[in-house]
Design a protein with these regions (language model features):
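A short loop-to-beta-strand structural motif that recurs across blades of beta-propeller domains
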Residues: 9-11, 62-64, 109-111, 164-166, ...
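A short beta-strand motif characteristic of beta-propeller blades
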Residues: 23-29, 76-81, 125, 131-136, ...
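Asp-box/WD-like beta-propeller blade repeats and closely related beta-sheet repeat scaffolds
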Residues: 74-145
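Blade-loop segments of beta-propeller domains
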Residues: 23-97
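Short glycine/acidic-enriched loop and turn motifs that connect beta-strands
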Residues: 2-5, 51-57, 106-109, 162-164, ...
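Short loop/turn segments immediately following beta-strands, especially the blade-tip
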Residues: 14-20, 66-73, 112-122, 168-177, ...
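Beta-rich, blade/repeat-based domains predominating
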Residues: 31-42, 84-95, 131-152, 187-204
Length: 231
């Protein structure tokens, strides 16, 4: 996404809250194909995935933490860590800002990373998906997004290759992800779920399906961590 001849990494712009106008973007930090970003709740750190398949000689991408200069929007690298899988395409944070989660598209895997008060990173979880679905582009898992539910107890991943929304239990103290039981919700074969969003009250969840340009709606039981399709 960002490896063309003109792009050098992550850019920032200032927003005028009265007029809605943005200033011309300026380089905030150089990076290797950064594709998705999240800012921690304390607004001190920005986390990015670098969507590569060649991190330090491994078929992997990386998670990078940056400290934010609030005065000019510039970023300084605090730490970098391998995602243990290729082409990480999404990253999100828990409510406390102590942990982030990543999804590897090519690797078909997900993981969790702990973030300390200095922005240092430590891999806390890694889970490899297995399986396939019906279309040629679904011959293997393709984890496309990963998000925590409003209760902070569960994390879900939309996997385009499996036609599933995979569900994990989350231990916020240890930063550990474990596969939940029942473990996943299916969408119609060939739909290809890409991203997932919870309603603010946590009672519903929605996935947009990339291949069929559709949306699937679910009821969410936050006690069990279970999704039930309703539309």
């Amino acid at each position: 996404y960002t490896r063309d001849k003109d792009s050098e990494g992550i850019y920032s712009a200032k927003l005028n809250l009265k007029t809605g106008k943005l200033t011309k973007p300026v380089l905030a930090a150089k990076g290797d194909n950064p594709s998705f970003l999240t800012i921690l709740p304390n607004e001190k750190f920005l986390l990015a995935v670098e969507e590569t398949n060649d991190y330090e000689g491994e078929p992997s991408g990386s998670v990078v933490s940056y400290s934010i200069n609030a005065s000019d929007g510039s970023l300084i690298v605090s730490d970098r860590i391998s995602t243990k899988g290729g082409a990480p395409c999404h990253i999100s944070s828990d409510q406390a800002g102590r942990h982030v989660f990543f999804a590897n598209y090519v690797g078909g895997s997900v993981g969790g990373v702990s973030v300390d008060e200095k922005g240092k990173l430590k891999l806390s979880s890694f889970i490899q998906h297995t399986g396939s679905s019906i279309l040629p582009r679904q011959k293997s898992p393709h984890a496309h997004s990963i998000d925590i539910d409003p209760s902070g107890k569960h994390v879900v991943c939309a996997d385009l290759g499996l036609d599933k929304v995979v569900i994990y239990d989350f231990d916020s103290e240890a930063g550990k992800l474990t596969v939940n039981e029942p473990g996943f919700a299916k969408v119609k074969p060939g739909n290809g779920p890409r991203h997932f969003a919870f309603s603010p009250d946590g009672k519903y969840g929605y996935t947009n399906n990339e291949i069929t340009s559709s949306v699937t709606a679910f009821e969410f039981d936050s006690t069990l961590g279970a999704l039930k399709e309703v539309q």
